[in-house]
């Protein structure tokens, strides 16, 4: 966010240095940019390569990245939200039909934040690419103590993107399909805070 406005998908550097080797993306870098990564945040902090609103479509093509890393970001993305229907908006833009534009606004599309995050991560990763995430778990004080935490994550969340039975519950919503490398929960610290850590791999086929 810059001067009260969300700056979406605006590269700060045209060719981030991280793209010269394996493409590794660090989502929610904040003020902790990592060397060797394309550092991404909604704010243009020092060291940020791409400013992006991750509740919208992510600014990378399909099968693009070798690794996506995120720590203490996904819980800040809304659990669900509604946006004007993108297909109707595109049709209205192409035809100039005001009735189609009104329909797009009056019939918004509901997006579930957790599903959107996982679907986009899967889309952007290359086959065999890794998603590495550390997120405050709902099983601890770490999730509930922060007033900016607005979506729910724990070990079982990842079942919906890895286990055939759970993935099949919402086939019209979930496109992501991952293999589990490791999912576990970090034991609480002295403040009762704990995190779920997940390493997931996009299948080769």
Predicted regions: what they are:
Residues 31-62:
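Adenosine-cofactor binding site in Rossmann-like domains, unifying the SAM/SAH pocket
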Residues 41, 73, 121:
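Hydrophobic adenine-recognition pocket in adenosine-nucleotide-binding enzymes
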Residues 67-73, 117:
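A short beta-strand submotif of the Rossmann-like class I SAM-dependent methyltransferase core
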Residues 87-100, 110-127:
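A short glycine-rich, Lys/Arg-flanked "PGG" loop and its adjoining helix->strand segment in the class I
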Residues 99-106, 136-150:
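Short, glycine-/aromatic-enriched active-site segment of Class I SAM-dependent methyltransferases
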Residues 128-136:
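Conserved beta-strand signature within the Rossmann-like core of class I S-adenosyl-L-methionine
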Residues 144-177:
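Conserved Class I S-adenosyl-L-methionine
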Residues 182-205:
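Core SAM-dependent methyltransferase catalytic element
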């Amino acid at each position: 966010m810059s001067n009260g406005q969300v700056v979406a998908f605006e590269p700060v550097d045209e060719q981030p240095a991280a793209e010269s080797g394996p493409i590794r993306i660090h989502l929610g870098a904040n003020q902790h940019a990592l060397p060797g990564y394309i550092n991404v945040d909604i704010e243009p902090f020092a060291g940020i390569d791409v400013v992006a609103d991750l509740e919208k479509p992510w600014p990378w093509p399909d099968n693009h990245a070798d690794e996506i890393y995120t720590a203490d970001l996904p819980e800040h993305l809304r659990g669900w939200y509604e946006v004007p229907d993108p297909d109707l908006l595109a049709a209205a833009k192409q035809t100039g039909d005001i009735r189609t534009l009104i329909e797009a606004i009056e019939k918004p599309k509901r997006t579930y934040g957790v599903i959107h995050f996982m679907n986009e991560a899967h889309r952007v990763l290359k086959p065999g690419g890794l998603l590495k995430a550390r997120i405050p778990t709902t099983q601890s004080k770490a999730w509930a103590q922060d007033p900016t935490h607005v979506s729910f994550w724990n070990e079982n969340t990842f079942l919906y993107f890895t286990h055939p039975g759970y993935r099949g519950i919402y086939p019209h919503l979930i496109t992501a399909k991952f293999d589990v490398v490791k999912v576990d929960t970090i034991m609480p610290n002295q403040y009762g805070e704990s995190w779920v850590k997940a390493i997931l791999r996009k299948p080769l086929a």
